[in-house]
Amino acid sequence: MGRAYELRKGRRAKRFDRMAKAFTRLGKEIVMAAKQGGGNIETNSRLRTAVNNAKSVNMPKDRIDAAIKRASGKDESDYEEVVFEGYGPYGIAILVECATDNNTRTVANVRSYFTRSGGALGKTGSLEFLFERKGVIKIDGTGLDPEELELELIDFGAEEIVKDGNEIFIYTAFVDFGTMLKELEQRNITVINAETERIPNTTTTLTTEQQEEIYKLLEKFEDDDDVQAVFHNMAETE
């Protein structure tokens, strides 16, 4: 699963890099985390994870600090986290995670992207069953034995551990994500990246031309400032 996850994430990252949106999205996550649990990274686990993820893509420290500071400002917007579900071309299921300060605007935009592509926005909960929400934690695997680590971490929610080069991927149920991060911290294991992923239960294979059509739609979503992440059940190819 580690390789498949990296492939999906890699394609998503390339699109975000092209749009120069990565820092904006990470900054918004930092703001939301700080608003929710305060600006102290030592006592706010969500903020700690958001900052760590920002550092993993070389987000400058001054931008990270500025995002934390913005959270306490009176003029900073409150963001609502919303998930939209719909079908794109060729019956591809798509989930769009958003953080918005104007839900009416976001609904209209997301619906238009689906409609213009020949797809349709669905009702809340209509497609979520096609995906399984997981915690995915990437750690530095130097000096670690994946099999021994799995035995040690199974009581903390480890469902699968996959080694890929010098890195190890730890998969957990969504409800065990925070518990696992806390345990890794206590063991002084270096976390490179940690996030939740909506992994499709099954995937649909398309032709190269059809895939490109889907990728264009994904880019439309990801180009929207309200969109934080997009997941789909199209089979990814190298």
From Swiss-Prot:
InterPro entries: Integrase-like_N, TACO1_YebC-like_2nd/3rd_dom, TACO1_YebC_N, Transcrip_reg_TACO1-like, Transcrip_reg_TACO1-like_dom3, YebC-like. GO terms for cellular component: cytosol. GO terms for molecular function: DNA binding. It is found in: Cytoplasm. Pfam families: TACO1_YebC_N, Transcrip_reg. Coiled coil: none annotated. Keywords: Cytoplasm, DNA-binding, Transcription, Transcription regulation. This is Probable transcriptional regulatory protein CHU_3516. The lineage of its organism: Bacteria, Pseudomonadati, Bacteroidota, Cytophagia, Cytophagales.
